[in-house]
Amino acid sequence: MSHRLIIKGCLRRARFTLDLDLDVDVSRPLGILGATGAGKTTLLRVIAGLERDFSGRVEFCGEVWHDGDHFDRIPTHQRGLGVVFQDGRLLPGRTVESNLAFAQQRARKVNAAVSYEALTEALDLNHLLSEPAEVLSGGERQRAALARALLARPRLLLLDEPLAANDADHRQQLIGHLAEWLPAEGIPLVYVSHAAHELAQLTRQLIVLGRGTVTAQGETHVLLEAQSEAIGRVARPVAAVVMSTDVERSTATLQLDHDAAGAPLPGERVLLQRELTEDSGLGAALQPQPDENEG
């Protein structure tokens, strides 16, 4: 079955203008890749109907969701969406169980391939069901929000960095579950992530955004391989360990480690795209990143 998503139009922002002319069948899961501020979150907000100023048209499966020329739009809650943003937004003042029940009450009437019990068990939520949403950690909120979105049995699932607050083990488990569940449920997916390995495992086609404009579009594995080769031509990766950081001075001290790979935190490892030797003086500048919700 085709799930054709059409987005044509513009939305002006302070740092970029989202300028889109997309026509894709999201029956094959679609990934969105781009730097912070490229417009990835804004694109998902346009699909979800959260950007009323979008001067264009959004269609899904032949249904017009937004027509800026005629000031016509279908409200977000009537689009049959499952949406998870990076902050894992839940209904305040309710327990996890109440949040999940809210989704079940409004779920589409379809045959479910994955049960409530299977979801809460696999997402490690059973011990949290009686907890208020406000006391959850970032990773717990994301998992609860993901369960709620799936329990709504959506027509289209929009995920924006939905695993970022979870540890590596949880992330890999969640990727495996999503890769199994979504085809079983027949749920089309639009997935935003900075993580190439997540996109490689969960999506089949990819759009690369740069300052609000599509700079590349094609098969996920082809575009990711091309990106990897381009980085490799620029420089040979050199691994190092971050020994200390000075946030006030925005500096970090690194030590080369040829077996290392990982994240730039004290005592952790980071890959550097520079040609270096053991005698190289090495430093790094820390730069605060803008809020992804702004782009």
What does each model-identified segment do?
Residues 63-67, 111-128, 179-180:
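Conserved ABC ATPase "signature" region
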Residues 65-82, 106:
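ABC ATPase NBD coupling module
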Residues 132-136, 140:
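Conserved ABC ATPase signature
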Residues 151-155:
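A short, proline-enriched helix->beta-strand linker immediately N-terminal to the Walker B motif
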Residues 157-161:
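Catalytic Walker B motif of ABC-type/P-loop ATPase nucleotide-binding domains
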Residues 186-194:
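Conserved H-loop
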Residues 211-212:
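Conserved ABC ATPase "signature" C-loop
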